[in-house]
Amino acid sequence: MIQPDNEKSWYAFKIFFGKGKPIKAYFVTNEIEHIYDVKKEYWDKNKKKKLVKEVPIMPSLILFRTTRIEAEEMERKFLNKVMLYRGKNSENLKEPSKISEREVKIFNIVATSGVEGLDFYDEYNPKFTKGDKFRVIEGPLKGAEGYVVRIKKDHKLYVSIKGLCAVTTGYIPKAFLQKIE
């Protein structure tokens, strides 16, 4: 099914060499809905003072909502700084990969929750999407859905955008999880 060129969808850029700030500035200036959140990290230099540094949560990925034509134009505008993900969620390998609204919403709940112990993965790993699916019903991750996986002897919630990336959480009490039938 071919989508009309003027219909807005979610897309993703892979960002090269930490060039996210000018791209985020472009999105803000042009009022383009996007997800490229930062967190504050504290650096202790010589144990004298603390330096606060803003670090992107997902340094090599920015999600944005626009039309297919605008997404391709932005890729040309930021040549050698970004790459538009293509063919991950569609049959045509040259077509930009559209991301469902639901996947973006669930991924954003986890990515921007501010909880400790989040690990981000630049690649989607289908081996972690086997088994039972769960929904978080309490706590700061309420509303997130994913698979409970075992990584380095710990059980974590694996939330992904199919074909693009994933995030795992730290420990979530079983009482906060509801199995999705």
Language-model segments: which ranges?
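Acidic-enriched and Gly/Ser
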Residues: 1-133, 158, 163-178
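Structural motif
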Residues: 58, 151-153
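Short coil-to-beta-strand transition motifs
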Residues: 128, 137-144
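Short beta-strand-centered aromatic/proline hotspots
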Residues: 143-151
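Residue-level signal for beta-strand positions within conserved beta-sheet cores that form or flank
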Residues: 144, 155, 168
